[in-house]
């Protein structure tokens, strides 16, 4: 029998932010009714645990070491109906030995059916293009995965030693060329994810959240952060950049106490990797493909608290401003003596933005602008410091990236699935002037979730409270869209 905290169930039922769904024999699956300001449910258990983690970092210990031998479970990841084009490349096949597993002993629910592969477009074979897949996945780090927060999941299925096998199997199964991960603990990156994925032909970069700088070496091991992995046969790392929002807030706080008191204390980060596409990744190859083509990949984990929607939006604006600086510098290095051309560097932005599709964060990223009077700013008096930060004196804040979201609500109704919150907070954005989505991974079967009364994740078959996103993109060579510029450096 699974233990469900009655107090939490009552809180969810009585919360104006939720309503229960009593279908399927009164399973009581919480269904989100959004507030006018479209913020996340304040009872989102994962976010409550993050807050406790900030307050109780000192008390970390490895969980479940005292338990008897856990049941081994051979994770069976779903196989897409249609495979992405890039999967037909043998370099995408994992060469690493799978982690050992045994038949399940306590699993009473069949695994979910395959997540469908949804074709969107055919590649344009008349121009050089690099076809690649990208995954975005919040893996739910060990520190946050407690019985107090996820009482509907068996203890053994919450244990990291069990979940990490399913997570790495899922990552390997989809074999994305670029992998964007959030909530990766420092020790787990260096001692698990990096060595495992290096065996599969990946290189990776990582940074923990900013608080790690103030901690001892022992405590630092358990701070989570963001990671980017890329297939070494397709990409080369040119430069990596860490974006620390608390440092940016402190440097731009003049004239706004709220920038110091609300934004600066939050230690979320963004991590960017400037990659060069290798020549053999282009099809068809031509003289144009001998010209170096940079791609900027960024992963971010934005602040969680729904009461701080202003912080979420400001962190996202800071992120876009820093990415613009990186792109401008990269464009200048590839085109010396010429005016910066941001189109020379394509942008891929992935992450857990903890923001719903109709939030200020997603409006800013997707539309390229947001009003200074947007409700998410909460009239906190950020106008002057944001104008100074973004060099903007108009009535709206803008960016010039021309981004599009790979997923929408019709395709993926939820990327985060817990007992008291189900919604979209994870995104993959791409430069729509330089990339075309060819296909994407569809959602987990809603029928399977309903018929098996899966009220939330993690679950013995689903290792995180987030579902991974996977998109196949066709990257067009910028030199094929226009005459090659004079002076473009060939950095082969």
Model-derived regions: residue spans:
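Divalent metal-dependent phosphoesterase catalytic cores across multiple superfamilies
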Residues: 109, 154-177, 188-194, 199-200, ...
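Metal-dependent phosphoester-hydrolase catalytic domains
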Residues: 2-46, 55-121, 265, 277-285, ...
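Acidic/histidine-rich helix-loop elements
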Residues: 140-161, 246, 250-258, 262-263
């Amino acid at each position: 029998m699974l233990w469900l905290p009655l107090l939490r169930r009552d809180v969810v039922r009585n919360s104006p932010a939720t309503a229960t769904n009593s279908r399927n024999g009164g399973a009581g699956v919480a269904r989100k009714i959004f507030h006018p300001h479209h913020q996340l449910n304040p009872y989102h258990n994962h976010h409550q645990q993050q807050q406790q983690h900030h307050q109780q970092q000192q008390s970390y210990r490895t969980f479940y070491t005292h338990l008897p031998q856990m049941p081994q479970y051979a994770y069976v990841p779903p196989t897409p109906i249609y495979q992405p084009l890039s999967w037909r490349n043998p370099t995408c096949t994992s060469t690493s030995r799978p982690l050992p597993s045994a038949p399940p002993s306590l699993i009473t629910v069949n695994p979910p059916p395959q997540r469908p592969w949804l074709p969107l477009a055919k590649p344009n074979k008349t121009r050089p293009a690099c076809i690649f897949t990208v995954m975005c996945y919040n893996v739910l780090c060990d520190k946050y995965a407690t019985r107090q927060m996820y009482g509907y999941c068996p203890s053994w299925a919450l244990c990291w030693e069990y979940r990490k096998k399913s997570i790495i199997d899922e990552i390997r199964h989809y074999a994305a060329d670029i992998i964007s991960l959030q909530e990766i603990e420092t020790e787990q990156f260096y001692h698990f994810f990096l060595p495992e994925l290096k065996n599969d032909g990946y290189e990776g970069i990582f940074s923990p959240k900013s608080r790690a700088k103030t901690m001892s070496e022992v405590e630092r091991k358990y701070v989570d952060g963001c990671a980017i992995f890329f297939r070494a046969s397709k990409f080369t790392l040119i430069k990596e950049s860490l974006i620390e929002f608390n440092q940016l807030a402190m440097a731009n706080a003049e004239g706004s106490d709220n920038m110091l008191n609300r934004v600066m204390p939050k230690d979320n980060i963004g991590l960017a990797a400037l990659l060069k596409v290798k020549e053999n990744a282009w099809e068809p190859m031509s003289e144009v493909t001998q010209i170096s083509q940079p791609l900027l990949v960024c992963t971010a984990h934005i602040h969680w608290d729904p009461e701080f929607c202003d912080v979420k939006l400001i962190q996202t604006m800071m992120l876009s401003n820093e990415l613009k600086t990186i792109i401008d510098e990269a464009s200048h290095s590839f085109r010396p003596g010429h005016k910066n051309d941001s189109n020379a560097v394509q942008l891929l932005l992935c992450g857990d933005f903890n923001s719903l599709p109709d939030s200020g964060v997603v409006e800013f990223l997707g539309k390229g602008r947001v009003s200074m009077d947007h409700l998410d700013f909460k009239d906190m008096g950020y106008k002057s410091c944001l104008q100074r930060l973004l060099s903007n004196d108009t009535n709206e804040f803008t960016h010039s990236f021309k981004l599009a979201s790979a997923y929408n609500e019709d395709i993926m109704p939820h990327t985060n699935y817990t007992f008291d919150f189900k919604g979209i907070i994870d995104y993959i954005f791409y430069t729509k002037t330089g990339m075309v989505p060819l296909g994407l991974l569809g959602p987990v079967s809603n029928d399977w979730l309903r018929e098996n009364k899966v009220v939330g994740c993690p679950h013995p078959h689903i290792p995180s409270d987030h579902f991974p996103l996977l998109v196949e993109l066709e990257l067009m060579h910028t030199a094929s869209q226009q005459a090659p510029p004079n002076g473009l450096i060939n950095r082969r």
